[in-house]
Amino acid sequence: MKKGTRINILTGAAIVPLFLMNLIIGSVDIPVADVFSILCGNGSDKASWEYIVMQARLPQAVTAVLCGSSLAVSGLLLQTAFRNPLAGPSIFGINSGASLGVALVMLAFGGGVTVGTVSLTGFMAVLVAAFIGAGAVMALLLMFAARVRNNVMLLIIGIMVGYIASSAISLLNFFATEEGVHSYMVWGLGNFGGVPMSQIPIFAVITAAGLILSILQIKPLNTLLLGEQYAENLGVNTLHLRNWLLVITGLLTATATAFCGPIAFIGLAVPHIARLMLGTDDHRQLIPGTIIMGAVVALACNIICVLPGNGGIIPLNAVTPVMGAPVILYVIMKGRR
């Protein structure tokens, strides 16, 4: 068995205790025996514990796994496609597009939108708005990508699109009500606990589709590591591959942002953690390793968020930079050497 495979198996095994800890730890500590009993369908003496586990903590843990995996793989695909170790899902403005969509709903329309006979409010309004915002930015980027071959120029375009979206959000914040600004700020802090159990299957199906499409790109991604010219000599259409990777990362990032809010650093840092652990750039090991590591990091971050217990929940985006920034600093210093 190869070293990378062994490490991926061991890292994957770590998901089980971390997932279980997410079900146990919180403002109410639930014994392990009761958690297992509830998961097995035998219930618990306390009905409130059953509700907490099945309707709050279980969807939260599943959301962490899905979001962590999708953002991590998105970062890996972009770092390989653009040969830039600091590329991440947020660099192309997809997060900003989703945020702009949510800002329009929360700040301009008061939390709900009515189109004809269809009325969307609350979570569904935010979800649809985030998808539309991210999709609009994705369409804009693909339009530019069809005309711009230079990867650096496309990166700059993505950054500029993000700045424009951020500027629009700032204007909306300025003219919005205090309640609207507060709601938007809470969403912007990121949260794995906002997805109801009824929405988990939708989240899981879209994420699984994106991850499968990513795995199918392993061979051309490995060829791309040898250089664009070499890859084209081997029959890889690098422009088509780049645009296809943008579509995959757009799908994964838009989905994660729509369901969980803009999550920082996971997409940027986790691919580097996977590379450091596996010691290889081979995507046959790296993509599965990044998927697993993304889930592990997201679950660990969620545990840290709920550690205060009755003291409240730490915002997710206050935890992810603490875990991700040291990794990025290490990569930068290593690059200088």
Q: Across the structure, where does each feature detected by a protein language model lie?
A:
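Alpha-helical transmembrane segments in inner-membrane proteins
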Residues: M1-R337
